[in-house]
Amino acid sequence: MVDNSKIRVVVGMSGGVDSSVSALLLKQQGYDVVGVFMKNWDDTNDDGVCTATEDYEDVKKVADKIGIPYYSINFEKEYWERVFQYFLKEYKAGRTPNPDIMCNTEVKFKSFLEYALDLDADYLAMGHYAKTMVDENGVTHMMRPKDGNKDQTYFLSQLTQEQIKRVMFPLQDLTKPEVRRIAEEAGLVNAKKKDSTGICFIGERNFKHFLSEFLPAQGGDMVTPDGKVVGHHAGLMYYTIGQRQGLGLGSTKESTAPWFVVGKDLEKNQLIVEQGYDSPRLYADRLQASGMTFFTGNPEEDTEFKATAKFRYRQCDVGVTVKYHAASKTADVYFDEPARAVTPGQALVLYNGEECLGGGNIDAAFKDDKKLQLV
Ligand SMILES: Nc1ncnc2c1ncn2[C@@H]1O[C@H](COP(=O)(O)OP(=O)(O)OP(=O)(O)O)[C@@H](O)[C@H]1O
């Protein structure tokens, strides 16, 4: 059996079952394991209970059970400056941001990784469902994990080679039910703990209410694409392209079909709405993305290649042709078939079969070379 005892691995422990089982597996494999809990947000809830404190209690219990040392580190300042300010700026600009991606690139796999390396760690391990593979040239590739249903490569898509080569994902060949079973058999207190959902700093709170505490909302008209006023919106930032819920609009003489958000006019502060799921205004055949990052390093020259892509987290891959512009690190992505509700601010993520190639941020979507008025 290989001797891993000289290899130090810092495990990011959230108090959840995934990172707990990650720590357990590494310990069983003989690594020198250290658990670290990160506090990113002062999340005292409406009843005055700080969920981070409860989570850290779980980390302590699990670490004691497994027999590993543990620490806690505060990254509230970094999180506030690099993730939350970006989140607010994007909403202000009418876009729909993805703070989880930013949290990974700027906090979990940057400040936290640096902290782990300062603790003399050889690797940082996380309980994400993702997989890495090192090729014969020593280059690390990002792969889809065994559990396709939990696949988190979408949120990791903007990490670099420098970051992923120091990272381990111990759950890469396990499914979530298998992870829960391992936790139960090992008697971990959080074996049945509920999965976290939604944006971490909002938790179970009402999204509109949360956002209104940070950004002043300016209400305006809801209009049809030909300019007819049909209602009032509470602030453009509360709506996302393709959204149906919460518009409060009923049937019309012409149609009983539900209403959907099909655009935003920031200048006029108007929300553009239309009846019917399949509005042609929602369908794009191309997008532009910036800040493109490839796990194996960005190509130095302009390139064109076929791939599959996701434009949002829970979506089946679609076939695309990518034209990458090396100087600006931007890409034009042409879809094999028109795609619905491609939303500026969300991430574009590219795949080649089982491999996740990388991604960027969606800036604009087009149909027949005409830019859709989505922000
Ligand atoms: N507060 C935290 N401190 C340290 N590491 C964290 C923290 N939050 C998340 N992580 C790390 O990031 C991974 C993915 O985070 P995510 O929020 O997606 O959790 P999850 O899939 O619900 O996992 P878990 O069951 O471990 O909470 C976690 O498994 C853990 O390794």
Swiss-Prot record:
Claim: GTP-binding is one of the keywords in the record? no
According to the UniProt record, where is the region Interaction with tRNA?
150-152, 312-313
Task: Identify the catalytic residues.
Answer: C103, C200
Query: One Pfam family name from the record?
Result: tRNA_Me_trans_M
Which key words are in the record?
ATP-binding, Cytoplasm, Disulfide bond, Nucleotide-binding, RNA-binding, Transferase, tRNA processing, tRNA-binding
List its EC numbers. Answer: 2.8.1.13
GO cellular-component terms in the record? cytoplasm
Q: List the Gene Ontology MF annotations in alphabetical order.
A: ATP binding; tRNA binding; tRNA-uridine 2-sulfurtransferase activity
Q: Which reaction does it catalyse?
A: S-sulfanyl-L-cysteinyl-[protein] + uridine(34) in tRNA + AH2 + ATP = 2-thiouridine(34) in tRNA + L-cysteinyl-[protein] + A + AMP + diphosphate + H(+)
Look up keyword Transmembrane and say if it applies. Answer: no
Query: Which residues are connected by disulfide bridges in this protein?
Result: C103-C200
Principal localisation: cytoplasm
Q: Which InterPro entries match?
A: MnmA-like, MnmA-like_C, MnmA-like_central, MnmA-like_central_sf, Rossmann-like_a/b/a_fold
Show the segment(s) annotated as Interaction with target base in tRNA. 98-100
Compartment(s): Cytoplasm
Q: Which SUPFAM superfamilies match?
A: Adenine nucleotide alpha hydrolases-like
According to its UniProt entry, one GO biological process term is: tRNA wobble position uridine thiolation
UniProt-annotated binding residues for ATP: G12, M13, S14, G15, G16, V17, D18, S19, M38, G127
Q: Which CDD domains match?
A: MnmA_TRMU-like
The family classification in the record reads: Belongs to the MnmA/TRMU family.
Query: What's the name of the protein?
Result: tRNA-specific 2-thiouridylase MnmA
Q: State the species of origin.
A: Lactobacillus delbrueckii subsp. bulgaricus (strain ATCC 11842 / DSM 20081 / BCRC 10696 / JCM 1002 / NBRC 13953 / NCIMB 11778 / NCTC 12712 / WDCM 00102 / Lb 14)
